[in-house]
Design a protein with these regions (language model features):
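Active-site regions of metal-assisted phosphoester/phosphodiester hydrolases
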Residues: 1-172
């Protein structure tokens, strides 16, 4: 895509990784898919490093990156899909390779901001959420991230999804 009024193209990739379920074939499929995502991300970041197009990989990865990304870390860590060390390692590897987790970069070292709340119980009301929706930017694009917004509904009844939109403004 070309940003409005700009000449610099940006590749936008929409990604989805299903939730999985610990110790099931569904989780095995998820764990087989994460390296494929990582391989494509390695190609994209190398392209920008060689003077090519910047990329933005965004979507629902169904994995938290750290304790700051889930309200209830202790009862979930290594007990539920999305909070397993082997999943988290993939997301952190991408950041180690140079990808910018734009919302975390902009939000800083704080709890949240969450983008997903279970429909069950009082998760939404108590803001017991997970940050599992990301915008990963190649380094040059990530440096131009200026602000973000999580489009969380004001009330439970106003929700149209268990996820909230994650918007990031980039200066291009």
């Amino acid at each position: 895509m070309r940003p409005e009024g700009g000449d610099t193209p940006v590749r936008v990739v929409s990604a989805y990784c299903h939730a999985g379920e610990k110790e099931t074939p569904k989780q095995e499929a998820k764990m087989a898919h994460l390296p494929r995502i990582g391989a494509r991300m390695a190609e994209l970041i190398a392209e920008e490093a060689a003077g090519g197009i910047s990329s933005l990989v965004c979507g629902d990865f169904n994995v938290v990156r750290s304790e700051a990304d889930i309200k209830n870390w202790k009862p979930n860590h290594n007990k539920r899909a999305g909070v397993l060390d082997e999943e988290i390692a993939f997301l952190n590897q991408w950041v180690d390779e140079g990808w910018r987790d734009t919302v975390r970069d902009l939000a800083g070292d704080v709890q949240g901001p969450y983008s997903w709340w279970s429909w069950r119980g009082q998760a939404f009301v108590n803001n017991a959420g997970w940050r599992i929706d990301y915008q990963y930017a190649t380094p040059a694009l990530g440096e131009r991230a200026r602000s973000f917004e999580i489009g969380r509904a004001d009330e439970y009844a106003e929700r149209f999804s268990d996820h909230a939109p994650v918007s990031v403004t980039y200066e291009i």
